[in-house]
Amino acid sequence: MKLRLLTLGVALLAHGAPAHADKLTDLKPVTDEGLQNVAPGNWLAYGRDVRNFGFSPLDQITPENVAGLQLVWARGIDPGQVQTAPLIYDGVMFLASPNETVQAIDATTGDLLWQYRYRLDTDPVLLNAITQDRKRGIAIYGENIYFSTWDNHLIALNMRDGKVVFDIDRGQGDEGVSNSSGPVVANGVIVLGSSCQYSAFGCYVTGHDAKTGEELWRNYFIPKPGEEGDDTWGGSSYEQRWMTGSWGQMTYDPVNDLVYYGSTSTGPASEVQRNMVGATQTGINTRFAVKPKTGEIVWRHQTMPRDNWDQECTFEMIVDEIDVKPSAGMEGKQAINPDAKTGARRVLTGVPCKTGLLWQFDAKTGEFIYARDTAKQNIVGHIDDKGIVTVNEEKVFKADGSPIDFCPTFLGGRDWPRTAYNPDTKVIFVPMTNACAEITPRTDAPDPANSYNIRAVYKLPEGKTDAGRIDAINVETGETVWRYEQPSVNYAPLMATGSGLVFSGGADRYLKALDQKTGELLWRSRLAASIMGSPVTYEVDGKQYLAIASGHAGYGAALSAVQEKKTDMSNVGSAVYVFALPDSK
């Protein structure tokens, strides 16, 4: 760890009316209580709060009046794969965008309050190309805004002026280690994962003191020789164990004082090329529950062993108190633990992997409760009543150059776009893609620079004509409430409101609202560019606003190859848009 006292970044304070300056001056430090019980008008984390619900209790915009939404303001942002979720704190929007930029913006007018731009001092050729322009999340705590950089730094900015408080170099940025999803704040600790798709080693999660940036702990995923799990890597040398990291969004449960994160797969994709035939590989595709102060692993559960298909299990899961009562007749049932206690329990639940399986665990102990399919998949062969996964042997690579057909693709099923969860109805809304693929291991020698070393051709699952999809599932029973499908790829995060709406973007450039009860499309508005940003909502002076950032179709463009009719996408015109209902006369 290195502390860079003289930052290469630049903060610019905008010169405007005193009212704008007052908004920044009046901001009070954000406390743990404030993050864990967010005031209704604020949005203080990627999923609004540390539990990652992606839900706001605001109810001014309703199914009955959503069609009246009008654009209030918009402003251009740096171009790139815009996947960001703005934070809103007492009328100030904090926005991270491509090209290592963080801005403070007046949330009611769109006026710039300050801007910080980080300047790389590493040759971009050495950096992780996948995370180049992706800033999904930033964090706020105390008086600071926290974000991670392309070259693997953790930076804290003063929220009032954008000046650097600290800059921590976590190391190996010039060897491809990076982060795209940003940190979570857990009881005074900044917890941050990492991505190393092109690296000849594994990655880690770190915990940092929120005031100083001091690294408190570092957890690796790939076992070294002699460590627990070493014998599950097929006798391969440590130098052959590549890429496993944790780049998805994390969740914090203040009741149990646990941070939950998930790990990714390894490379190359083919276990034949890895020299690990049949090896389950402890550490990959695993859900971890850790103590934020120390990094102590309290429990773990592997949700996709022996991964030949890049089915990374690193996406957010949510924590809530529910009435556990899994239905034996749930659609896509894989397994129900007959020994798991039903009734009131605090659970960790969600869709953590690209396979699209919905998993549920006891939040404190990790006891498996149930698992079910959502999207079409044929690579999980069996899950027993303890949640142990066996893969479908027919879909495992046997030789280089020999293709297999499998579902879903290495883009999901479900990928990183955020789910939304209504804690009142206990329904989770999951963005997915109907897609399968033919993948072939390349015959050239595997190398970290080639990542998974495969070729892929996408197609729709048999019997499907629509690529885009959103499922609503009751997490208490596991039963499907409704399913919304559309011709174009969705591949965009979701947001739910207390008034009964679900908002989403998509590759087709539409910002849309669905009815939470039925899945009916109620409203949509077409923006200049495709939408991968996370919708958020907030309230200032009694008025509710809806915000979304757009700018790129991302992998939605690749997935569109499955569609019969091509989507009208655009990667030009990156901007943040803010909508509201017209003032009553």
Each model region followed by its residue ranges:
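Repeat-blade elements of multi-bladed beta-propeller folds
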Residues: 43-47, 79-101, 127-154, 178-202, ...
